[in-house]
């Protein structure tokens, strides 16, 4: 839920840290019904697609209860498991605010839910993307530590002027990451698990490249926010993310300053290519060719 730049102060009605009350009691039945529709169609298809850590998190937080979750309820279990809580925010928050929340084990989640006609695509993350997509993974201790470390690293990246590189790491792991498991590729990224169409595309479509995770490679790679990804990076396990947090990012930023960015569809020497994509979807015009990302 991060926006751009530094905070110039919260909007009216928000606290200094940009949080607001969730106002769970104000949701209408129609809004609860949207959650139920989204939840049921995602969980029906995610078995055998989402990683075990995500599926265990769904169960641990009892997110299958009917309707939009009450943050106060899920926070009791989440805090017990990993020390994290979910806090409501009015929308995208500035980068410095976002990093501060993560560094203190608070995940900022949008309070609103999409309209019924927006089930398959929404430009700004809503409560379904943020809570269904992100929060189950926060029940895993290793992933929870990674997210806190990311927040701490974000504050340093802002000071060094390397936010673009760090944002790519978040994008290609937390939002659109895949994992190699003994049972095959599995999804752990929130942008995929919360999207019916991208849950299929990311694993099954021949279009995108699927490349083994390499930290510096990921931090050099551009990304697109308007459609399916043209490349997915694949970790071997959640432990890979723990290893990332132990790296000297200062030295990495120095090296990245002297090399060029990598395009979204490029394969470069040294890549561990799992799937060399056809890029047919992007070449045909992406969503304009008939497929919708959600």
Swiss-Prot record:
Gene3D superfamilies: Aromatic amino acid hydroxylase. The keyword Metal-binding applies. SUPFAM superfamilies: Aromatic aminoacid monoxygenases, catalytic and oligomerization domains. Keywords: Iron, Metal-binding, Monooxygenase, Oxidoreductase, Phenylalanine catabolism. The keyword Metal-binding applies. Its EC number is 1.14.16.1. Fe cation binds at residues 129, 134, 175. It catalyses: (6R)-L-erythro-5,6,7,8-tetrahydrobiopterin + L-phenylalanine + O2 = (4aS,6R)-4a-hydroxy-L-erythro-5,6,7,8-tetrahydrobiopterin + L-tyrosine. Residues 1-20 are annotated as: Disordered. PROSITE patterns: BH4_AAA_HYDROXYL_1, BH4_AAA_HYDROXYL_2. One of its GO terms (molecular function) is phenylalanine 4-monooxygenase activity. Pathway: Amino-acid degradation; L-phenylalanine degradation; acetoacetate and fumarate from L-phenylalanine: step 1/6. Coiled coil: none annotated. One of its GO terms (biological process) is L-phenylalanine catabolic process. Its cofactor is Fe(2+). Binds 1 Fe(2+) ion. It holds the Pfam family Biopterin_H. It comes from the Bacteria. PANTHER family: AROMATIC AMINO ACID HYDROXYLASE, PHENYLALANINE-4-HYDROXYLASE. Belongs to the biopterin-dependent aromatic amino acid hydroxylase family. This is Phenylalanine-4-hydroxylase. The gene is phhA.
């Amino acid at each position: 839920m991060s926006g751009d730049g530094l905070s110039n102060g919260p909007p009216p009605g928000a606290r200094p840290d940009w949080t607001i009350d969730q106002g769970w009691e104000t949701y209408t039945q129609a809004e609860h019904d949207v959650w139920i529709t989204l939840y049921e169609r995602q969980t029906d298809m995610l078995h055998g697609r989402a990683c075990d850590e995500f599926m265990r998190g769904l169960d641990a937080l009892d997110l299958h209860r009917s309707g939009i979750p009450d943050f106060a309820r899920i926070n009791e279990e989440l805090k017990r498991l990993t020390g994290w809580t979910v806090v409501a925010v009015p929308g995208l928050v500035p980068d410095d605010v976002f990093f501060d929340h993560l560094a203190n084990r608070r995940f900022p989640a949008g309070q609103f839910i999409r309209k019924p006609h927006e089930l398959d695509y929404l430009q700004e993350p809503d409560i379904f993307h943020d809570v269904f997509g992100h929060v189950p993974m926060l029940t895993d201790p290793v992933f929870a530590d990674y997210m806190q470390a990311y927040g701490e690293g974000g504050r340093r990246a802002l000071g060094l002027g390397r936010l673009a590189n760090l944002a790519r790491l978040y994008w290609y792991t937390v939002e659109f990451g895949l994992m190699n498991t003994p049972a095959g590729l599995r999804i752990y990224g929130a942008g995929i698990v919360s999207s019916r169409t991208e849950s299929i595309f990311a694993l099954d479509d021949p279009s995108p490249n699927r490349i083994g995770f390499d930290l510096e490679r990921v931090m050099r790679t551009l990304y697109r926010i308007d459609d399916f990804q043209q490349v997915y990076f694949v970790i071997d396990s959640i432990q890979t993310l723990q290893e990332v947090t132990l790296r000297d990012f200062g030295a990495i930023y120095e090296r990245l300053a002297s090399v060029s960015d990598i395009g979204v569809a490029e394969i470069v020497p040294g890549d561990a290519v799992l799937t060399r994509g056809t890029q047919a979807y992007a070449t045909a015009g992406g969503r304009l060719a008939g497929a919708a990302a959600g």
